[in-house]
Amino acid sequence: GVIPCGESCVFIPCINKKKCSCKNKVCYRD
């Protein structure tokens, strides 16, 4: 929830679902 993963989840979910979660249309790690 703090560190950006460099992914966006506007149209598709986060690619790295195990480490990253979607928040505010951006994927964050933890």
UniProtKB/Swiss-Prot annotation:
Record-linked Pfam families: Cyclotide (PF03784)
Keyword terms: Disulfide bond, Knottin, Plant defense
InterPro entries associated with the record: Cyclotide, Cyclotide_bracelet_CS, Cyclotide_sf
Cyclopeptide (Gly-Asp) crosslink site(s): G1-D30
Residue pairs linked by disulfide bridges in the UniProt entry: C5-C20, C9-C22, C14-C27
Gene Ontology annotations of biological process type: defense response
Keyword Protein transport belongs to the record: no
Signal peptide: none
Modification(s) after translation: This is a cyclic peptide. Contains 3 disulfide bonds.
Keyword rRNA processing attached: no
Function in brief: Probably participates in a plant defense mechanism (Potential). Binds to and induces leakage in phospholipd membranes, particularly ones containing 1-palmitoyl-2-oleophosphatidylethanolamine (POPE). Not active against Gram-negative bacterium E.coli ATCC 25922 or Gram-positive bacterium S.aureus ATCC 25923 up to a concentration of 64 uM.
Protein family (similarity comment): Belongs to the cyclotide family. Bracelet subfamily.
Domain comment as written in the entry: The presence of a 'disulfide through disulfide knot' structurally defines this protein as a knottin.
Protein name: Cyclotide mech-1
Native species: Melicytus chathamicus (Chatham Island mahoe)
